[in-house]
Amino acid sequence: MFEVKMGSKMCMNASCGTTSTVEWKKGWPLRSGLLADLCYRCGSAYESSLFCEQFHKDQSGWRECYLCSKRLHCGCIASKVTIELMDYGGVGCSTCACCHQLNLNTRGENPGVFSRLPMKTLADRQHVNGESGGRNEGDLFSQPLVMGGDKREEFMPHRGFGKLMSPESTTTGHRLDAAGEMHESSPLQPSLNMGLAVNPFSPSFATEAVEGMKHISPSQSNMVHCSASNILQKPSRPAISTPPVASKSAQARIGRPPVEGRGRGHLLPRYWPKYTDKEVQQISGNLNLNIVPLFEKTLSASDAGRIGRLVLPKACAEAYFPPISQSEGIPLKIQDVRGREWTFQFRYWPNNNSRMYVLEGVTPCIQSMMLQAGDTVTFSRVDPGGKLIMGSRKAANAGDMQGCGLTNGTSTEDTSSSGVTENPPSINGSSCISLIPKELNGMPENLNSETNGGRIGDDPTRVKEKKRTRTIGAKNKRLLLHSEESMELRLTWEEAQDLLRPSPSVKPTIVVIEEQEIEEYDEPPVFGKRTIVTTKPSGEQERWATCDDCSKWRRLPVDALLSFKWTCIDNVWDVSRCSCSAPEESLKELENVLKVGREHKKRRTGESQAAKSQQEPCGLDALASAAVLGDTIGEPEVATTTRHPRHRAGCSCIVCIQPPSGKGRHKPTCGCTVCSTVKRRFKTLMMRRKKKQLERDVTAAEDKKKKDMELAESDKSKEEKEVNTARIDLNSDPYNKEDVEAVAVEKEESRKRAIGQCSGVVAQDASDVLGVTELEGEGKNVREEPRVSS
């Protein structure tokens, strides 16, 4: 049994309007961007392309397809995606229009507008306009291409050649309504060869055309009209006002909704195929097949990676691929544009009560096509036969793209399809356009020069529009100045002073200030050679330096001043070693020199660290350090981290207490600041747990004591009640004092026993409380000891 769904939805079919259905389906796209809600019956009819035949039989607007004579309902939003308005008038279904256009391109000719119209239609049109039937075709073309005999000009001033109706713009005084018909039949969806150059129906184009036609002779008018008609027939050719720089991208890719497939009305525009006529013709010619474009997908970084799977749009996969009911899927054979057949695994992954369709095993195919992230994979189908074809289209400026920077179907850059060689037509190669005056060009004179406003010598066909990109380099790791490798990069102030040398050509001026001689120079200092000074056992000092050419060590006087660039030739102090070919000093002396240099460096580094360690904190810094470090303030830091560079040394936050990466866990006997803090926290935590446990025990003891006291009182009251209600003992003498005293003593002893039991419980509880107090005191002493020691 089907469950009827009711709610606030209502079927958007005007002849239905139901609010309850078994299943709600999606229909035609609305102006708001959403899809119409249809009931199960209406939605099924819409998906089967039988909506108008079932619900709009008696409505007006029915016409026949120009090619297959199929009845089409024009002007209905439900059949909008299944109808194509032909360039030469009339309507056609999407399948016939696409196939007819491919056949025209295959023949390599583009017949005129009137040669493709039926003779009956042309004769009727001439009769209605009052034209004589004997007019030849040349007369028709000799008339100016005008529009405006239509009432739509009042409401659509931005369309048409409205100003061409003026008497100045006509040469024969006749009007041609065929151009108006051509304007009426402008396709709702642009054809495959429609370009994005200049709209010939724009008002600026029309105005400039009128002004230009005033200055040309009647003999040239026919040629101008011929070129204008050619522009209308072949919108894919570059427009006359398009500069040569944009000629390469004049044939832009415009997405067209698919003509077939289940739920094709649900496909988003970014998945619509964007083939050009040349690409389809090239692929069809290579494979000797009739190709029907289906959809395309821009590769993401994961699609082009080594994972080996291509994520497909859900609507496209369900519309054009075989239906699958199991998650494992089925093997699917797809052929590429070179004719090679690939076998992929077509499956889906459950995802939030939905499905994510993927093609697995696509890595070899993508690698053979040499695709990367940002390129586009296209899917087509062979008609007839239904075989799937997989093509590709590389993105322009692939080197400038970082990852997948393009969205699906929104690329405005020029692209090239694999296996397709596209040669954009040159503007200068058209003989008709060359006869059009400059006024029709619509470009300023400075941009209409031979160099197009550019530099002389530049080839305008090779000039490309540069894309503004920002090169993002690899992330540089932060230089850790405290590492052992970077220690060698440190330079103390004394070493920097040793590198500064006075200019050798300048003599100093000696000034005495407070009995101290100071040398003053007029020229700035120069950088000298870095050397090592050693001391002999006799106390004599020597200077050692390396040659920049042979890297050999040379012994020099201690007062020698070397330039920044020093070689053995400059060694004027030792004639035997003034050449790079001279042997070096003994190895033993060199080892001593290098050892002295390393010890000197280490000693200076140790002195600087000792000076830093001697700087004890004071004031608030000392209190903060004592609170954090405790009694380990003087110990060196063992496990430092650079995760929080602004944190104080010894910070015990959750980030800084983590051990450094790659060094593992600390030993149990580790006494660093982090481990001490963790141990102290653990000890405090255990003391708190023990204290809480003792408190719970005391509470339980008090509750038990109360219960015992209540029980004793109940027993006592019961005994008193029994005594009061007891029978008279005939064997006892009420006036016998001994019997009365014995009964009283027995009662007193029972009362004392009850009191003694209660006092024992209280004493035990008091001892427990005393133990808790002692533990608290110990914890307090443990916390106060680090502060006292600090």
Swiss-Prot record:
Pfam families the record matches: B3, zf-CW
Transmembrane segments: none
InterPro entries associated with the record: B3_DNA-bd, DNA-bd_pseudobarrel_sf, Znf_CW
Zinc finger annotations (CW-type) as residue ranges: 538-588
Residue ranges of the annotated DNA-binding region, renumbered to this chain: 295-396
Location of this chain's protein in the cell: Nucleus
Keywords: Coiled coil, DNA-binding, Metal-binding, Nucleus, Repressor, Transcription, Transcription regulation, Zinc, Zinc-finger
KW Zinc (keyword) present: yes
Basic and acidic residues bias locations: 694-724
Protein's job: Transcriptional repressor of gene expression involved in embryonic pathways, such as LEC1, ABI3, and FUS3. Repressor of the sugar-inducible genes involved in the seed maturation program in seedlings. Plays an essential role in regulating the transition from seed maturation to seedling growth. Functionally redundant with VAL2/HSL1.
Annotated organism of origin: Arabidopsis thaliana
Ranges in a coiled coil: 685-732
Residue sites binding Zn(2+) per the record: C547, C550, C568, C580
Entry's Gene Ontology cellular component terms: mitochondrion; nucleus
Record's subunit section: Interacts with SNL1.
Superkingdom per UniProt: Eukaryota
Tissue specificity field: Expressed in flowers and at lower levels in roots, stems and leaves.
Protein name: B3 domain-containing transcription repressor VAL1
GO molecular function: DNA binding; DNA-binding transcription factor activity; zinc ion binding
Biased composition (Polar residues): 405-429
Any GO BP: negative regulation of DNA-templated transcription
Region named Disordered: 234-260, 400-429, 446-468, 689-737
